[in-house]
UniProtKB/Swiss-Prot annotation:
SUPFAM superfamilies: CNF1/YfiH-like putative cysteine hydrolases. Keywords: Chemotaxis, Hydrolase. One of its GO terms (biological process) is chemotaxis. This is Probable chemoreceptor glutamine deamidase CheD. The keyword Hydrolase applies. It catalyses: L-glutaminyl-[protein] + H2O = L-glutamyl-[protein] + NH4(+). GO terms for molecular function: protein-glutamine glutaminase activity. InterPro entries: CheD-like_sf, Chemorcpt_Glu_NH3ase_CheD, Cytotoxic_necrot_fac-like_cat. Its EC number is 3.5.1.44. It is an enzyme of class 3 (hydrolase). It comes from Caulobacter vibrioides (strain NA1000 / CB15N) (Caulobacter crescentus). It comes from the Bacteria.
């Protein structure tokens, strides 16, 4: 059996990681993809073993210390799951390196959840002793991210988000038929 290693997104096996998910692999033919707004994706890998993974979380934590069915939405849980899965697949903690993406502020007037998410990810990784070798967080654009865990390559594309209110025009109603004199319409 021949194994091929390439960074060609058209030939790679794509795994889309959605909100609340994580995925880990050592397969050199896999590219992980996600789309982020204020959410964060951490791409963590062991460059020596070739094991890597991506998560995608919505909020840094629940704020109330609960561990319930919604835990997958939160950064602390997502980071723990990703790191533990990497270690189970043969990665070594002392060799892990991270790249983080997302954390945009997409809507004016709302709290900056994206900045909180990015700050959480940076703090968590620092506290765990995992260096961040690259990051692209903040700003006002959503991101499309592709991550090749075996090589560590990441491709990011900014996605335009137009928050300007659209000029909505209501269709002109058709004219009402003329009522013949003496006729009465009852509703």
């Amino acid at each position: 059996m021949t194994s091929f290693h390439h960074d060609d997104p058209e030939r790679a096996v794509k795994v889309h990681v959605t909100q609340g998910e994580s995925h880990v692999t050592a397969d050199p033919n896999v590219v992980m993809t996600t789309v982020l707004g204020s959410c964060i994706a951490a791409c963590i890998r062991d460059p020596q073993s070739g094991v890597g993974g991506m998560n995608h979380f919505l909020l840094p934590d629940s704020g109330d210390g609960r561990r319930d069915g919604d835990a997958v939405r939160y950064g602390a849980y997502a980071m723990e799951v990703l790191i533990n899965d990497l270690l189970k697949r043969g990665a070594r903690r002392e060799r892990l390196e991270a790249k983080i993406f997302g954390g945009a502020k997409l809507f004016d007037g709302l709290s900056d959840v994206g900045a909180s998410n990015a700050a959480f990810a940076e703090r968590f990784l620092r506290d765990e002793g995992i260096p961040i070798v690259s990051s692209s967080t903040g700003g006002v654009s959503a991101r499309r991210v592709e991550f090749w865990p075996a090589s560590g390559r990441v491709r990011q594309r900014l996605v335009a988000v137009d928050n300007a209110p659209q000029d909505v025009r209501r269709p002109t109603p058709p004219p009402m038929p003329a009522v013949a004199s003496g006729d009465v319409d009852l509703f």
